[in-house]
A protein has these predicted regions:
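N-terminal substrate-binding region of glycoside hydrolase catalytic domains
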Residues: 59-163, 298, 325
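Glycoside hydrolase catalytic-domain groove-lining segments
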Residues: 120-144, 254, 260-302
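Aromatic-lined carbohydrate-recognition surfaces of secreted/lumenal glycan-active proteins
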Residues: 211-240, 288-301, 323-329
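Substrate-binding cleft of extracellular glycoside hydrolase catalytic domains
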Residues: 112-229, 327, 349, 369-373
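Alpha-helical scaffolding within the catalytic cores
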Residues: 87-96, 117-131, 162-171, 231-247, ...
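Aromatic, loop-rich ligand-recognition surfaces of beta-strand-rich domains
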Residues: 1, 14-58
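Substrate-binding cleft of secreted/luminal carbohydrate-active enzymes
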Residues: 64-82, 181, 290-377
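Aromatic- and acid-rich polysaccharide-binding/catalytic face
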Residues: 102-114, 242-270, 327-329
Length: 378
């Protein structure tokens, strides 16, 4: 909100005097300060420090009071041809739900963050594969949004025009609304396999720059932004610690984490191979944010049944975890993460997931919150 210009001066014209203004009842996020000398234009002004202090109200979005969203990344290539039942759906929601015997309330999908891509691509995929479930409610859509350039280029504004166009398209899609988008931009930034790792300072600048554009275009009030590192920083240096990449509570709605045992080429100590231990780092980043396993699953480097048991022990051991997403596929580097690759582990998953705590539907209270936020963001 606009405020009247205020002039600060001191008797000598050159002391270290501080000016102070109380805007305790002004709701704003951005502050613009224009500094102008009262003397002639040739007078030099020496500004030592400017501080703006205040409180930011940052409430939590779409957190179920009881339970945890049951999610997955279920690509068709995660199923052998003979198990696809003739399906050609690249997002094999129906096959995965049949496999585990329970419906999903959250689906993960991916798109590169680069010029030439647009939101309508994802909205079309969303309409085809997420749709409505059998009780007339939507599944949540978790959107892995992957940059292909280093963070310094993003921090310098190289993607500004792309983000403006993209978020304007998101804001215009409310007529085709299917619930809020859960943006998960530039995940696993503390892992050396991403093109945007290793530069925490510019990562924070890039994230805030992207978020500010989204906010100014009316996207942040309704949708969700998930900040999501890898559970283990690689390399494990202090400079590459996940906390260094955190853009701050006021720029993040949920904390996410990629939760896997070591790859075939990596070496972890035994106690860092399983979910309950791997979750410890993300909890230290922010004290209050809700947490999700934004992708995870076992591999050939761990005991599959122990992994599944710990996955479901999150209910009692880690109550801040309010969503879990199983990544159901295999690759050469990480081994076979598919639930169906181990019949005993699959049967254990099918048994434990039947607990109503693992939500197959979005709760009514969350739907009410969705409608309220949607109406307030118009």
């Amino acid at each position: 909100k606009a405020a009247s210009p205020i002039t600060y001066s001191d008797s000598n014209g050159k002391s270290d005097a501080w000016g102070k203004t109380d805007f305790s009842n002004v709701a704003c996020r951005y502050v613009k300060a224009t500094l102008k000398s009262s003397a002639s234009t040739s007078t030099m002004m020496l500004i030592d420090e400017i501080k703006v202090m205040g409180e930011f109200h940052n409430d939590m979005k779409y957190v179920p009071e009881k339970g945890c969203y049951h999610g997955a990344f279920p690509p068709l290539y995660g199923f052998d041809p003979e198990d696809r039942e003739g399906s050609t759906d690249q997002c094999a929601v129906a096959l995965f739900e049949k496999l585990v015997g329970k419906q999903l309330s959250m689906i993960l999908w991916y798109q590169n963050m680069e010029p030439g891509r647009n939101f309508s691509e994802m909205q079309t995929v969303r309409e085809k594969y997420w749709g409505k479930n059998y009780q007339g409610k939507y599944r949540f859509f978790l959107y892995g949004w992957l940059p292909v350039i280093p963070t310094q280029q993003m921090a310098n504004g190289e993607l500004d025009d792309f983000h403006k166009s993209y978020f304007a398209e998101v804001a215009a899609q409310k007529v085709r609304d299917m619930g809020p988008i859960w943006f998960r931009p530039a995940n696993e930034m503390n892992g050396s396999w991403t093109p945007y790792y290793g530069d925490p300072t510019n990562y924070v600048k890039a994230w805030r720059r992207m978020y500010n554009i989204a906010e100014q275009l009316g996207v942040t009030a309704y949708n969700v932004f998930v900040w999501s590192p890898n559970s283990v920083s690689m390399p494990g240096t202090e400079a590459n610690a996940m906390k260094n990449y955190y853009p701050g509570d006021m720029y993040v709605d949920w904390l996410g984490v990629s939760c896997y045992p070591p790859s075939l080429s990596a070496t972890y100590p035994e106690d860092r191979r399983y979910p309950l231990t791997l979750m410890q780092g993300i909890k230290q980043v922010s004290a209050d944010k809700p947490i999700m396993i934004s992708e995870g699953g076992y591999s050939s480097t761990c005991d599959h049944q122990r992994w599944v048991r710990e996955w479901f022990k999150l209910k009692d051991e880690e109550p801040r975890v309010k969503a879990v997403v199983w990544e159901n596929h295999e690759n050469a580097e990480n081994g076979d993460r598919r639930l169906q690759s181990d019949p005993l582990a699959l049967e254990l998953y099918k048994e434990l997931v039947q607990d109503p705590y693992w939500l197959d539907l979005i709760p009514d209270a969350v739907y009410s919150e969705i409608e309220t936020r949607k109406n307030n963001s118009k």
